[in-house]
């Protein structure tokens, strides 16, 4: 269920401060964050944000299409290795 419009989008303040500082300085280095729950704002467009997936930081280049989505949507946490192959099908 989506968040109530009355409440507005959520973003961690520490991430917002880092993004504002990077935009102000025109800094293009990746911004490390563990905040997968934060919503992507229009200010983020063009920045690279390294989102933690539980094991490492995955670099995410933010585009205009990503605005309104959560950061965690673009850093998958599970690795799919495929189903076990049938031994009879290999022959």
UniProtKB/Swiss-Prot annotation:
GO process annotations (BP)? ribosomal small subunit assembly; translation
Keyword annotations for this protein?
Ribonucleoprotein, Ribosomal protein, RNA-binding, rRNA-binding
Check the record and name the InterPro entries matching this protein.
Ribosomal_uS19 (IPR002222), Ribosomal_uS19_bac-type (IPR005732), Ribosomal_uS19_CS (IPR020934), Ribosomal_uS19_SF (IPR023575)
Q: Does the keyword Kinase apply?
A: no
Pfam families, from UniProt? Ribosomal_S19
Q: Which domain of life is it from?
A: Bacteria
Entry's Gene Ontology cellular component terms? cytoplasm; small ribosomal subunit
Q: Which Gene3D superfamilies does the record associate with it?
A: 30s Ribosomal Protein S19, Chain A
Q: Which GO terms describe its molecular function?
A: rRNA binding; structural constituent of ribosome
Family note = Belongs to the universal ribosomal protein uS19 family.
Quote the function comment for this protein: Protein S19 forms a complex with S13 that binds strongly to the 16S ribosomal RNA.
Q: Which HAMAP family match?
A: Ribosomal_uS19
* Official protein name in the record: Small ribosomal subunit protein uS19
Q: What organism, scientifically named, is this protein from?
A: Marinomonas sp. (strain MWYL1)
Q: Which gene is the coding source of this polypeptide chain?
A: rpsS
